[in-house]
Amino acid sequence: MSMTDPIADMLTRVRNAHHAEKADVRMPSSKLKRAIAAVLQEEGYIEGYREVGEEKKPVLEVTLRYHEGQPAIREIQRYSRPGLRVYRGRDELPRVRNGLGTAIISTSKGVMSDGQARAQGHGGEVLCWVF
């Protein structure tokens, strides 16, 4: 069975694992999911990630971060979706919770946080936001 929105599936798995207080979560891997996990790690929302399993069907294992028993990710939500893509120019990139959160942007130079995209002067598709 094909999946219509693998990014939403990834975000839901991370959200559910946090609610269940799991140490890590596994999901099917892809280049875009690895890039999103890299941004989450750079911004301090997850401990790390690694690819495990066979070469034909790799699995992405994300190690979640907790601070004093509370999840590092309070909210994680899909912004642009397959039925309604959302693109923003460099001057229109969203600020999540007045700069306390992070938007993850897919640009022509790769996947990056909203702060990096603003600093480099890039716009792109707003994939999701994290707080």
UniProtKB/Swiss-Prot annotation:
One of its GO terms (biological process) is translation. Keywords: Ribonucleoprotein, Ribosomal protein, RNA-binding, rRNA-binding. One of the primary rRNA binding proteins, it binds directly to 16S rRNA central domain where it helps coordinate assembly of the platform of the 30S subunit. Pfam families: Ribosomal_S8. It comes from Halorhodospira halophila (strain DSM 244 / SL1). This is Small ribosomal subunit protein uS8. PROSITE patterns: RIBOSOMAL_S8. InterPro entries: Ribosomal_uS8, Ribosomal_uS8_CS, Ribosomal_uS8_sf. SUPFAM superfamilies: Ribosomal protein S8 (SSF56047). GO terms for molecular function: rRNA binding; structural constituent of ribosome. The lineage of its organism: Bacteria, Pseudomonadati, Pseudomonadota, Gammaproteobacteria, Chromatiales. Part of the 30S ribosomal subunit. Contacts proteins S5 and S12. It comes from the Bacteria. One of its GO terms (cellular component) is ribosome. Belongs to the universal ribosomal protein uS8 family. NCBIfam families: PRK00136.1. The gene is rpsH.
